[in-house]
Design a protein with these regions (language model features):
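Hydrophobic, aromatic-rich alpha-helical transmembrane segments
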Residues: 2, 6, 62-65, 98, ...
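N-terminal transmembrane-helix/juxtamembrane module of multi-pass inner/ER membrane proteins
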Residues: 2-77, 120-131
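Membrane-embedded catalytic cores of phosphoryl/pyrophosphoryl-handling enzymes
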Residues: 4-7, 128-226
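Hydrophobic alpha-helical transmembrane segments of polytopic
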Residues: 12, 70-77, 109, 113, ...
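Hydrophobic, lipid-facing residues on alpha-helical transmembrane segments of integral membrane proteins
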Residues: 14, 18, 103-118, 149, ...
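Aromatic-anchored segments of alpha-helical transmembrane domains
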Residues: 17-21, 112-115, 177-187
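Membrane-interface loops
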Residues: 28-39, 83-171
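Membrane-helix interface/capping segments
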Residues: 57-59, 63-66, 79-95
């Protein structure tokens, strides 16, 4: 089981990298919006399928607002676990005594922020519409990636951090709900190419799988110590 989990992480990493390269290189055509600054039409990879789906899924302000505001709720999980960590620090007065899964979460959040910043600089393609009088980086869908990473990590970490079963169940239901609503509404909003959503799912799946490996290792160590 342990070996299979690590292999799955590697497979997902390779899939995310290969897919990103393919998006940047395969079937790249100028089907995106015109750059207001240069007057040049932006190019997009997998243009045939992206163009087909974009024509079916025009911009929908309702789904856009849903993905935007429900996405904000995901940061409630970050605040929740940060609060638990702070409470543990106040009680135990020793950083080393804080639950190691909380530390793993903190490091994971930093990694997510780094990946987010990386793709803001490394522009693979631009959004299918101009929303702020300028082209915006579109790959991967940051809302998709953040929702899956934040909510998915909560699902994995809650069993080690939240001892109250009822609260844990509520957290997990909320995590699944927010994650699904954001991903689906982001696709239906029409503010991303189809491959942006897929890329976001692949990248975040690798990150969540790897985080899960870390959590399982911590849990095993804690069980052995007890």
């Amino acid at each position: 089981m342990k070996k299979r989990n690590y292999i799955l992480s590697i497979v997902l990493l390779i899939a995310a990298i290969v897919f990103t390269i393919l998006v940047a290189k395969i079937d790249v055509k100028p089907i995106g919006p015109i750059n207001p600054e240069t007057g040049i039409q932006s190019e997009v990879g997998f243009s045939t399928i992206n163009s087909l789906i974009a024509k079916k899924l025009q911009f929908n302000s309702t789904f856009y607002k849903i993905s935007k505001y429900v996405g904000y709720l995901a940061f409630g999980f970050v605040a929740f676990y940060a609060l638990i960590g702070l409470i543990e620090l106040i009680k135990k007065k020793n950083l080393k005594e804080i639950n190691k899964v909380i530390w793993a979460l903190a490091i994971f959040y930093i990694c997510v922020a780094i990946v987010y910043a990386l793709f803001e600089v490394l522009t693979i393609n631009y959004r299918p519409l101009v929303m702020k009088n300028e082209l915006e980086a579109s790959y991967p869908s940051s809302h998709t990636m953040l929702a899956i990473c934040v909510c998915g990590s909560s699902l994995l970490a809650s069993y080690s951090i939240v001892k109250n079963k009822k609260i844990r169940i509520i957290l997990n239901i909320a995590a699944w709900g927010i994650m699904l609503v954001v991903v689906v509404s982001r696709l239906l909003s029409g503010v991303h190419w189809f491959t942006d959503i897929i890329g976001g799912i692949l990248i975040s799946s690798f990150m969540i799988q790897t985080f899960g490996n870390v959590v399982r290792k911590i849990q095993k160590t804690q069980e052995e110590d007890n």
